[in-house]
Amino acid sequence: MGKNTKRNKKTKQQQQQPQQNGVTASASGTAVEDFEDQQAASSLPSLNGKKRSQLNKLVEELLDLVEKQPANPNEEWKQYGQLQELLKQIMILEEPLSQAVCPQISDSPDDQTRLAKVEAFSAWAKDGGVHSEGLEIAIFPGYQLGLRATRPLAKDELVLSVPRKLILSEENNSDCRLFGKMTQATHLNLAYDLVIEKIRGEFSEWRPYIDVLPAKYNTVLYFTTKQMELLRGTAAAALAMRQCRVIAKQYAFLYKYAHTMTEPSTGNRSHPGERGLFFTQHGLCYKLYRWAVSTVMTRQNLVPSEKQESEDGPKLISALIPYWDMANHRPGKITSFYATVSRQLECTAQEAVNTGEQFFIYYGDRSNTDLLVHNGFVDPNNTKDYVNIRVGLSLTDALAAKRASILDKLNIRHTAELRVLPAPDFISKELLAFVRVFKMSAEQLDHWCSDLDRAGDLLHIDCALETDHETRTWQFLEDRLKLLLAVFNKEMHEADEVKELELKDGQEIELMLFLYRRLERSILAGALQYAQEHRKV
């Protein structure tokens, strides 16, 4: 693996020295790494006792807040506002530390700053075994950094490969694992490892890669309350606020464990997790954790674990793949795969690319809601887009058990989020079947329950049903879609607002949110017209 200059120099010197045995070499290397750990930690500012005490109190309040599950959208919005206020106070107290580990970038785009470090990163990647002949990193308006073709690339041509040793996953820093036997999502393990490497600064072997990562993101973790308010009433609102709640809770757990549940760590490598605890105690702050989680959310890919097994083979774990993750998204097909035999990620061109054009990859089938919340962008040409509608059986419905038996046969949950689709389908078969079951009379339920093997017919648009039943089904869908669209009708001057925003700098998030609203409204409006036409028929 390519390493920074200091680490390379150190390694060469060690190789040149005669060694009497492996133990001596190992002890020497450990001593150097221990010294580097201490150097990295000592370079960071420490908070005084008063600020630490205030932070401890705020983190306890934060944990108490996020433990409460909001009962409805209004409560969820109120909780989000309280959460943002607490995080604001926490970030003010942590500011000296934040400036050290996540230095503020000026209002000008940070891509020029990153581009200045691209040369060092490209050399590091090449030394580490990345093969990217025909590609280079460049600035593209509207994308920041991306990959540019330096020669014509043929469709299906292998254009990029990244070896396992240059793929950052939770298995790289297992000695830093803070959580012991606690089960944690793989992407959060990776985010924690990235926190550690960021704190290690110049002593991290991943420094050239970290230096070219964005300084901030357009993910929901960076939204202001005013920006989040633009999502209220949309399908993305609950998911976005839930994401903020989960990450705040995880940060608070890490903070509490490091500062109120354990003694100060010396970073003793002989004790599992001590190095991680050591760096967490010295460098963890919310801005750093938010950055690390956003980095993972926007750039991760899954690779097979080399240490963990599942019932179906190697467990899939989250990973950051340097150089490959510079490629931006365009609709198409997935052309990136991990080759187990050669232990590398391989990427082919999904289309022919001319010299000087941007090289794109396809991130996979995701709705714009998912792209917005987890990737920080939306795709106006997304053919796989959809809008979720939450539906559920009533607990007070005397016929709920019969409805449930039909839904069980259809593998549809009794309370579920089901899809409204773009043209030409509009209503997913699962949503249509659910509403058909939901609007059945007692007699109709008896008829369908008497032969559950026929339940699959309810998934088809041309299923033979009584006219009054179909009318009730489409009327329900029409009414529900009108309610969902009502939230957009409140914004009568949205087009004017977009034009005004386009004339200002630094409005990327607002423009993205208005685009998302327009795309969701378009799907719902198309489905409403479709439902109205079917009701009339």
Curated annotation (Swiss-Prot):
Residues 1-12 have a biased composition (Basic residues). Pfam families: Rubis-subs-bind. InterPro entries: Rubisco_LSMT_subst-bd, Rubisco_LSMT_subst-bd_sf, SET_dom, SET_dom_sf, SETD3, SETD3_SET, SETD3_SETD6_MTase. One of its GO terms (biological process) is positive regulation of transcription by RNA polymerase II. It catalyses: L-histidyl-[protein] + S-adenosyl-L-methionine = N(tele)-methyl-L-histidyl-[protein] + S-adenosyl-L-homocysteine + H(+). S-adenosyl-L-methionine binds at residues 114, 143-145, 299, 325-329, 375-377. Residues 1-50 are annotated as: Disordered. Its EC number is 2.1.1.85. One of its GO terms (molecular function) is histone H3K4 methyltransferase activity. Disruption phenotype: No visible phenotype. Cells show complete loss of actin histidine methylation. Gene3D superfamilies: Rubisco LSMT, substrate-binding domain, set domain protein methyltransferase, domain 1. It is found in: Cytoplasm; Nucleus. One of its GO terms (cellular component) is cytoplasm. Keywords: Actin-binding, Cytoplasm, Methyltransferase, Nucleus, S-adenosyl-L-methionine, Transferase. Its main location: cytoplasm. Residues 133-364 form the SET domain. Belongs to the class V-like SAM-binding methyltransferase superfamily. SETD3 actin-histidine methyltransferase family. Protein-histidine N-methyltransferase that specifically mediates 3-methylhistidine (tele-methylhistidine) methylation of actin at 'His-74'. This is Actin-histidine N-methyltransferase. It comes from Drosophila melanogaster. The gene is Setd3.
